[in-house]
Amino acid sequence: MCIRDSYKTLEGARFYDASLKLYEGLSAELGFNLLFSQQGHLTLAHTDRAMFVMTERAEVNRLAGIDSRVIAPDEIQRLAPSMSMTPDAVYPVIGALYHPPGGIIRHDAVVWGLARGADARGAEIHPHSEVAAISRANGRATGVTLRDGRKVGAGHVVSATAGWSSTIAEMAGVGLPITTHILQAFVTEALKPLLDVVVVSSQMHVYISQTDRGEFLIGAEIEPWTTYRQQGTLNFLQESSRHTLELFPQLERARVLRSWAGLCDISPEFSPILGATEVEGFSISAGWGTYGFKAAPIVGRTLAELIATGSTPALIEPFALERFYRDRLVSELGAAAVSH
């Protein structure tokens, strides 16, 4: 899973930067190796327009104190010597936004580590327990009812349910401006080390990294249609493979091990919806699209502060649901070259 904080708005950049800093110390805090490798992140530019966008993002990042800069092809080649830089390619690489603190982390290790830490601190985890309803009394959320009929009371209910965010929020009487799409990815067989930086291309709609086990992890953009059906498509495999081979032709004979599709909840301007709602005792962490994993630590910390104090932390104030009614949007549309 890719981790970075090179976003295009000051609100977003500062928020994700706080999360990245928490990730840097999370292995030690949890006593669990999360396999976090800050190997760097390259967002490729293939046109003059793309170079302008990269320069703009680099300036926003600089204002937020984030290490992010535009680099030329010779430095790109030094960072990714195995990548094809042929000038007569369909999409020639003319520059890139280089973000040194970015990198990859094992998502399953993060989940296991956080679950173990939560359990050690007295939290109860109920896997495979579907929520069927949110209980309310006098306009306040008071708990949840599970599909098997069990009721769980709570002083505060938080929905952090990704693709099902709008469905869960409706149970509490809250409408969210969210659509649900699928995001696909696949991995190859393990290969010798070829790439130690994350490579992303917006025009090719592909992102590529190599795991510590040698597998190449390859993904693309969210699919344009709305669905809850988590089924991959042949077109994704064909197009992603084609563009990957334009950058790394040496992968021509690599075998695909597995592919998958997950659900993403997308807000109108690709920024999250965070914090309290008009229903007392019901808060949300929604609208993450493809960015949510990067923000997990800081979301947990800020929502815990909101629940404990009743006040919204300044870091998440810009992402309140009410911004859509006040025309105070925080547009991160295009902040990811592709969905990662």
Predicted regions and their residues:
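Short beta-strand to alpha-helix junction loop
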Residues: R14-D17, L44-V53, L97-R116, H126, ...
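Helical element adjacent to the flavin cofactor pocket in flavoenzyme catalytic cores
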Residues: A96-H156
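Dinucleotide-binding Rossmann-like beta1-alpha1 core, especially the glycine-rich loop
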Residues: R4-S82, H205, N235, H243-L245
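C-terminal catalytic lobe of FAD-dependent flavoproteins
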Residues: L245-H340
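Active-site substrate-recognition segment that forms the wall
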Residues: G31-G40, A133-S135, R140-A141, K151-E280, ...
